[in-house]
Amino acid sequence: NNCPLDWLPMNGLCYKIFNQLKTWEDAEMFCRKYKPGCHLASFHLYGESLEIAEYISDYHKGQDNVWIGLWDKKKDFSWEWTDRSCIDYLNWNKNQPDHYKNKEFCVELVSLSGYRLWNDQVCESKDAFLCQCKF
């Protein structure tokens, strides 16, 4: 694998948790500026969720939820990944997504679920975040 030392290699891509708190959009922009082709992380298999959850539990400083690259751009429960990969796997927390008060359109990993399950959240909330890159 060609991933830098503190990145997690998985299925040909590299993943890294960033502990600074950013809004969803600022986090996606940070990932994109880090290196061309980088985005907030996308998930396609249950096994990836478990491996990422373990990695975040090991390396994340703090109890913050963690942004991933899923969002509801059209605000109608039609979810999209920022890397434009296909939506072939979802792992929502119980009773989610709910677009609570019609304000939640960005997706985070829930720290209380051990970073395994997903919640839709207000995009202006500040979370830690997970970038995905190809090196």
Curated annotation (Swiss-Prot):
* Membrane among keywords: no
Q: Where is this motif: Galactose-binding?
A: 96-98
Which segments constitute the C-type lectin domain? 10-132
Q: Which UniProt keywords apply?
A: Calcium, Disulfide bond, Lectin, Metal-binding, Secreted
* Tissue distribution of the protein: Expressed by the venom gland.
Give start-end of the signal peptide. none
Q: According to its UniProt record, where is this protein located? A: Secreted
GO cellular component term, pick one: extracellular region
List S-S links within the chain. 3-14, 31-131, 38-133, 106-123
Q: Select a single GO molecular function from the record's annotations and give it.
A: carbohydrate binding
Q: Which residues of the sequence carry a binding annotation for Ca(2+)?
A: 96, 98, 104, 119-120
Q: How does it assemble?
A: Homodimer; disulfide-linked.
Please report which protein family the annotation says this sequence is part of.
Answer: Belongs to the true venom lectin family.
What is the annotated role of this protein in its UniProt record? Beta-galactoside and N-acetylgalactosamine (GalNAc) specific C-type lectin.
Protein name in the entry = C-type Lectin CRL
Q: Which organism is it from?
A: Crotalus ruber ruber
The taxonomy runs: Eukaryota, Metazoa, Chordata, Craniata, Vertebrata
